[in-house]
Amino acid sequence: MAACGTAVIAPVAGIVLEVTRTDTWDAKVNAGATRGGLSWSILGDDGIRYYGSHLSAIEAAIQPGVRVTAGQRLGKVGRTGDTTACHLHFGISPACTGAGDWWIRRGVVWPWTYLDAWRKGTPKSPASAVSAWQREHGCPKKPLTNP
């Protein structure tokens, strides 16, 4: 968990794919597409999609199609969408359609191995794990399980 308001930075250089600036999640509907609240996704220069959600704010300059650099501020940790505590949901996945495939975008490989390595300054790429997942699953057109 991270404290509310903690800066969220780009994990890699790349192009912004999606930005959600309005929290439309409703517990009565519980739609998977809106569970992340305020969120962003980036297609990294490594060909991997990175996703962050539950933010309280996203920087105005962060827009689809904009190039970001590793370490660039994207927003602030919050508790929008389907959550009660402040935290950043961080997903790593293949780019697939690039937009609209929330069931993939929210992450298909466990991110901690990479987050821990990056925190220590070790350049560890999730590319092989993401490629292995995609070889097995492809790019599903709908959620594989009940969201």
PLM features per residue range, with description:
Residues 1-6, 43:
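A structural micro-motif recognizing beta-strand termini
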Residues 11-64, 86-87, 91-94:
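Zn2+-dependent peptidoglycan hydrolase active-site motif and core
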Residues 22-24, 74-82:
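Short, charged beta-turn/beta-strand-edge "cap" motif at the junction between a beta-strand
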Residues 63-66, 91-147:
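Acidic, glycine-rich catalytic/binding loops that coordinate metals and/or anionic ligands
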